[in-house]
Amino acid sequence: NDNIRSMGVALTPCIIPEVGKPGFSIPDGKIEIGMGIHGEPGIMLSDRMPADELVDMLMGKLLNDMPLADGDRVSVMINGLGATSLEELYIVYRAVQKQLSGIGVSIVMPHVGEYSTSMEMAGMSISIFKLDEELEGLLADEAITPFYTNVNK
């Protein structure tokens, strides 16, 4: 979709249930930027960094690919990959919210939690969903599925 951009980061590999061990490795002190939840290779390895710096890097890539302007409305999803605490995810959300509000972008219906995970993988993804009136209405509609529920009407 032209209105959604996502990028994730992995701090540790996922465990493959059938074999009981990681299917890949990430060197100590490194993170993999852009890694997929199934272990698909990312775009680069980087040294570990504070959350605010990591968010700056990820948001820079997202906003470079999908520029936003003063007055835009977005929904944000901070998705934990399976072994990242909710507290850590909210630290990421705080940094995303600060950055977006700084350019005049409003966040509607933020989602922070584990929505799509991998076994024991530490990391998270940031998804930005640019809304128009129709999309915002659809996002607010009731939804009950195994992986996503919205009954906040």
Please report, for each region that a protein language model flagged, where it lies by residue.
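Mixed-charge interfacial surface used for oligomerization/domain docking
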Residues: 1-91
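C-terminal non-catalytic interaction/assembly regions of soluble proteins
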Residues: 61-153
